[in-house]
């Protein structure tokens, strides 16, 4: 068992428990959705494992960091939905560019000028809704850039 502290109160969990479980326990105390944990003053994603003895607070979609995390998740959801619904042939070499925020939204476009028709947009929207309902975790991994250069360059 490990102990984590929220508002000075200890909570005990099994060794392999994620912050998400603690967030779910405490969510009724929050008006808005919990999207990040602050662990000993450092931001952590909810899918990370609880550290024994840590002091935890939570950020919701009402905080600046929470809004940024939420937007990043929505962009990743959009990218997955595009990959699932629009053929490789149709996408070609187009990449999605997220340029800036508009009010509470984001301005996104394809860098090579691809324009989706109304039916394709509906398919992407439906795919995003299905993915959201499936509630898949979004996990961030850091990969050393030296791993990118293990193969000889085509110019060699």
What residue ranges belong to the model's regions?
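Conserved glycine-bearing catalytic or ligand-binding loops at nucleotide- and phosphate-handling centers
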Residues: 122-138
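Extended, well-ordered alpha-helical scaffold/bundle regions in very large, multi-domain proteins
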Residues: 114-124
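Short acidic, glycine/serine/threonine-rich loops at helix termini
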Residues: 49, 70, 120-121, 151
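Conserved small/polar residues in nucleotide/adenosyl-binding loops
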Residues: 149-156
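Short His/Asp/Glu-rich catalytic/ion-coordination signatures at enzyme active sites or charged loops
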Residues: 103-116
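Ubiquitin-like/PB1-type beta-grasp interaction modules and other compact soluble beta-rich domains
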Residues: 1-75, 80, 87, 91-105, ...
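A glycine-rich phosphate-binding loop feature that marks nucleotide/adenosyl-phosphate handling sites
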Residues: 100-104, 142-148
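Generic structural motif
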Residues: 37, 138-140
